[in-house]
Structures are given as C-alpha cells and as structure tokens.
Amino acid sequence: MVRRDRLRRMREWWVQVGLLAVPLLAAYLHIPPPQLSPALHSWKTSGKFFTYKGLRIFYQDSVGVVGSPEIVVLLHGFPTSSYDWYKIWEGLTLRFHRVIALDFLGFGFSDKPRPHQYSIFEQASIVESLLRHLGLQNRRINLLSHDYGDIVAQELLYRYKQNRSGRLTIKSLCLSNGGIFPETHRPLLLQKLLKDGGVLSPILTRLMNFFVFSRGLTPVFGPYTRPTESELWDMWAVIRNNDGNLVIDSLLQYINQRKKFRRRWVGALASVSIPIHFIYGPLDPINPYPEFLELYRKTLPRSTVSILDDHISHYPQLEDPMGFLNAYMGFINSF
C-alpha cells in the first residue's frame, strides 16, 4: 500500500513537472532574435537587396578608388555573413573601384526559406545573378573567399573554365581557411550532429542558443584573437535573423556535396591558369596544419600561399585584419 502510494505521488510529480515544462519550452522556442548592435544595424541599412527567383538577397556594394577598373567580390563563410569582411572593407576600397559582398541564401540578412534544398550550385548562381543585376557580368572579377565561400568560388571557377555564356570572367582567386579538400577537413562536433542528425537535427536547431553557439565557435579562433562578447552577439544576431538557426542543418549539407563533387571542384582549381592565392591561419582546427597545407601545395603547385602568424586560426580576416589585407594586396599587386 505504501509503495503504491509512493508511485502515485511520483506520477503526480512528473505530471506537474511536465505541465510546468511545456509553457517554459514554448516560451524558450519563441525567444525573439537579439536586437542588432549599432554597427550591425549600420551595415544592414547601408546595404541593398536584389531578388533571385522570388528570394531577397542582401548585398553590399561600395565604390572605392576612382580611376581603377578593378572589382573584388567577397564570399563569406559558414555560419556567418558578409559582415565577416567589415574589418578589411575600408582597406579594400583604397585599392579597388568596386567592393561587393553578399549574404548567401540562408545566411545573414538574406532570405532563409525552409524547407529548402540549399546547394553550392545555387549559391554560385546567386553570385552570377547579382553581378548581372549590377551590370558587371562582362567585367573581369577578382574573387576573395573564406571557408564556405571557398567552395562557392570553386564552382564559379569550374563554370568559368567551361567558358559558358553568362558565367563570370574571373581575373584572380584568393581563398582562405576553407575545407577545399574533404580528406583534410575536420568539422566541429555540432556540425556533424546537425549534418547527420536526421529527425534529431530540427530539434537541435530549435534548442540552439547563444551559449551553445558561442561555446562552439570560440575554439576556432586563436587564443589571443578570440571575438569579444559583443562580436559574438553580432554573429548570433545575424544567424537568428529570419530564423536562420532553423536552416543550419540544411546548409550543412554542403559538406556532403563537397565530397560528392570533389573531382569537379578540386579539378577546377588545379586546371585553370588564372592567379590563385591562399591566405592561411595555421592554427585552424578545421583545416589543420600541416596536413592541409601539404596537400594544398602538392595539388596546386602553381598557387602562392601566405601563412599568417602561428596564433591565427580559422577566421584570419577577423583575427588579423592587417596581416590578411597585406597578404591579399601583395597577391593582387603581383600580377
């Protein structure tokens, strides 16, 4: 009798816990995205949108030095946005006539449709569409990319190599800390869980918060160059914009695409004759030294490489903007 009464009280306790947890969970899942900081708000309001197949794509387009014909297009990484380039933006405008960056579909201030089959091919088509929108489809373009953007650049390079009409005419390509080789790429644990989580992935994306995000991202920065709390909040605010946290698992399918299309994308890098450069933060745990660099130099012996200081990691343009900019300008001025 005593045991039965104890079981009854335990069941009642769990019911009460459940009744309390349901509204708390509902409130948690409907927490609004954080407000944009003044700097991030300024970045958004100074940008523009264009429409690609009914979807709004955010971009920045600055006119820089007068009299120069040079154009540079910046392709950002995962899971952030074009705001990754803000520390070197002014420096680029002193060298280029046009400095252009976009938020890929599913990133930043661009639309984040769901469900949607996000692909590198679509992102490359969006870049081409943006340049047509700006009337630059027949101009020679310098590409500067990072991480996820490196893969998009590889697809653009493949299309350029095919010499098809309507494709970009690429003058040069500079990559940085991207997993262009599947065999040397080391994704984070959270990325693995979201990419291959199946029915669990949508639950994980809904439960993701600033604490989980910041603890996951901070280790890919060097020990002396980690982002401040406010910088992390800026990154998180951009991800949460348009419920971007809910499409992260879909965006991560690019890792599988990279394996499937390795021959196409690595082959494009190895076979073109344009100047190619790589800026490398050697402390990168995602593309580790020396395995990555050895394979890169073996596969692309004609490419030049800039290795930044030993403590610079996966986000070199944020961790060492001056070193990154100097390395890029050295490359651009070499041909």
Curated annotation (Swiss-Prot):
Residues 71-310 form the AB hydrolase-1 domain. InterPro entries: AB_hydrolase_1, AB_hydrolase_fold, AB_hydrolase_sf, Epox_hydrolase-like. The keyword Endoplasmic reticulum applies. Keywords: Endoplasmic reticulum, Glycoprotein, Hydrolase, Membrane, Transmembrane, Transmembrane helix. GO terms for molecular function: hydrolase activity. A motif (RVIALD) lies at residues 98-103. GO terms for biological process: regulation of lipid storage; response to retinoic acid. Expressed in mesodermal tissues. Isoform 1 is exclusively expressed from the paternal allele in all fetal tissues and cell lines examined, whereas isoform 2 is preferentially expressed from the paternal allele in a tissue-type-specific manner. The keyword Glycoprotein applies. It is a multi-pass membrane protein. It comes from the Eukaryota. The chain crosses the membrane at residues 13-33, 63-83, 266-286. One of its GO terms (cellular component) is endoplasmic reticulum membrane. Its EC number is 3.-.-.-. Belongs to the AB hydrolase superfamily. This is Mesoderm-specific transcript protein. It comes from Mus musculus (Mouse). The gene is Mest.
